[in-house]
Amino acid sequence: EEPGHFAARHLLGVVYLERGEYLVMIAGCHDCHTPNFLVNGGKGVEADYLTGGKLGWRGPWGTTYPANLRLYFQKMSEDQWVGVAKEIQRRPPMPFFSLNAMSEGDVRAIYKYIRWLGPAGVAAPSFVPPDKEPPQPYVQFPVQ
């Protein structure tokens, strides 16, 4: 392989990583999926980025918890993620409709960035049905 080809491939990888990092930030992924990101004014510890958390989001649907994306992404290929991102539907407050609307290039960039971060943390707590009391802490959404 010619040196220029290697450099071009490396640069393309860096561009994808930077794009993925940017998209994760502006799409608000850290807000729920990075522990304490919201309460720390949009600041987090990179070692904890996208590792989910134990803060529940409770509403008429039950109580949901932000998934550990760094573990989740280890279970699928990039092409599988592209398919999931276009079709996924989740309980609130996950804005799955925003993910569904992203371009394939953006979805791939997010995948590359999260895979680059590597596996870390533990799985999120399981969903709690609406008729069960979840453990603290949780954010209570108003009942409509």
Model-found features: residue ranges?
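Short Cys/His-rich Zn2+-coordinating modules
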Residues: 11-15
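Short, cysteine/histidine-rich loop/knuckle motifs that typically chelate Zn2+
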Residues: 31
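A structural feature that tracks compact, well-ordered secondary-structure segments
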Residues: 70-74, 83-88, 96-99, 116
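Homeobox/homeodomain signature
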Residues: 19, 59, 66, 84, ...
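Flexible coil segments in periplasmic/lumen-exposed cytochrome c-class electron-transfer proteins
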Residues: 1, 9, 26, 34-64, ...
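Local sequence-structure signature of Cys/Sec-based thiol-disulfide redox active-site neighborhoods
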Residues: 21-27
